[in-house]
């Protein structure tokens, strides 16, 4: 029987719109960061050594961020191309009527991707793709380096934004921080002032969001859970922090955070998973 997801495509304009908007916002943040590091506007000005160190840190963060984004988008966590027929169906297997296929435990069907995802966690709206077995590692590293980049930009833009705000009344300051678009459209700020306020606002909010996401998924990582399993209170796959880290990040789990292209193959296949019950039977 043909698989409906084999012919389906999620590469249309609606599916790619979140990714395009995310890329445009990331480009704006990158340009603002380069502007601050190269020209050093606002007090206090960066010295040559400080500027060189900041540029090196920014390059390291951006390489890691872009590398993990590329790995995340290139990795397919779905059942496409995975040989499921002929495998022994055991406890936890289910039949997906949309995909017309048996699917293994921890899988879930995504209505946006129109296919079942191995070890499905959730659908990432900003990047337009599901987070699952095949791309969980770059997703976690992406959260870490995105939070770092956004925090870095916020700190660098802080002095310039502070100088801008001190030159105006408190009401003007509040309006610029809360309604920068309105201030631009009414002609009360220049385009450069709007860009400074808007990028700083979004960077602070983005850093908080990515930081919260990293803490949440770090907790799930140590517990060996997906978001769905956490919501349902399931702990069947929690084999201890060390085993859970290796299962999700590979044997070099402590180093994968430093470079996206570091080889650390996952020990599993996304289809069969060891449970706490299996460990108990083996020990007995």
UniProtKB/Swiss-Prot annotation:
<feature type="topological domain" description="Extracellular">
    <location>
        <begin position="159"/>
        <end position="166"/>
    </location>
</feature>
<feature type="transmembrane region" description="Helical">
    <location>
        <begin position="202"/>
        <end position="222"/>
    </location>
</feature>
<dbReference type="GO" id="GO:0005783">
    <property type="term" value="C:endoplasmic reticulum"/>
</dbReference>
<dbReference type="InterPro" id="IPR001594">
    <property type="entry name" value="Palmitoyltrfase_DHHC"/>
</dbReference>
<feature type="transmembrane region" description="Helical">
    <location>
        <begin position="167"/>
        <end position="187"/>
    </location>
</feature>
<feature type="domain" description="DHHC">
    <location>
        <begin position="94"/>
        <end position="144"/>
    </location>
</feature>
<dbReference type="GO" id="GO:0019706">
    <property type="term" value="F:protein-cysteine S-palmitoyltransferase activity"/>
</dbReference>
<feature type="transmembrane region" description="Helical">
    <location>
        <begin position="19"/>
        <end position="39"/>
    </location>
</feature>
<keyword id="KW-0449">Lipoprotein</keyword>
<keyword id="KW-0564">Palmitate</keyword>
<feature type="topological domain" description="Cytoplasmic">
    <location>
        <begin position="188"/>
        <end position="201"/>
    </location>
</feature>
<feature type="topological domain" description="Cytoplasmic">
    <location>
        <begin position="74"/>
        <end position="137"/>
    </location>
</feature>
<protein>
    <recommendedName>
        <fullName>Probable palmitoyltransferase ZDHHC24</fullName>
        <ecNumber>2.3.1.225</ecNumber>
    </recommendedName>
</protein>
<comment type="function">
    <text>Probable palmitoyltransferase that could catalyze the addition of palmitate onto various protein substrates.</text>
</comment>
<feature type="active site" description="S-palmitoyl cysteine intermediate">
    <location>
        <position position="124"/>
    </location>
</feature>
<feature type="topological domain" description="Cytoplasmic">
    <location>
        <begin position="1"/>
        <end position="18"/>
    </location>
</feature>
<dbReference type="GO" id="GO:0006612">
    <property type="term" value="P:protein targeting to membrane"/>
</dbReference>
<keyword id="KW-0012">Acyltransferase</keyword>
<keyword id="KW-1133">Transmembrane helix</keyword>
<dbReference type="GO" id="GO:0005794">
    <property type="term" value="C:Golgi apparatus"/>
</dbReference>
<dbReference type="Pfam" id="PF01529">
    <property type="entry name" value="DHHC"/>
</dbReference>
<feature type="transmembrane region" description="Helical">
    <location>
        <begin position="138"/>
        <end position="158"/>
    </location>
</feature>
<dbReference type="GO" id="GO:0016020">
    <property type="term" value="C:membrane"/>
</dbReference>
<keyword id="KW-0812">Transmembrane</keyword>
<keyword id="KW-0472">Membrane</keyword>
<feature type="topological domain" description="Extracellular">
    <location>
        <begin position="40"/>
        <end position="52"/>
    </location>
</feature>
<comment type="similarity">
    <text>Belongs to the DHHC palmitoyltransferase family.</text>
</comment>
<dbReference type="InterPro" id="IPR039859">
    <property type="entry name" value="PFA4/ZDH16/20/ERF2-like"/>
</dbReference>
<feature type="transmembrane region" description="Helical">
    <location>
        <begin position="53"/>
        <end position="73"/>
    </location>
</feature>
<feature type="topological domain" description="Extracellular">
    <location>
        <begin position="223"/>
        <end position="284"/>
    </location>
</feature>
<keyword id="KW-0808">Transferase</keyword>
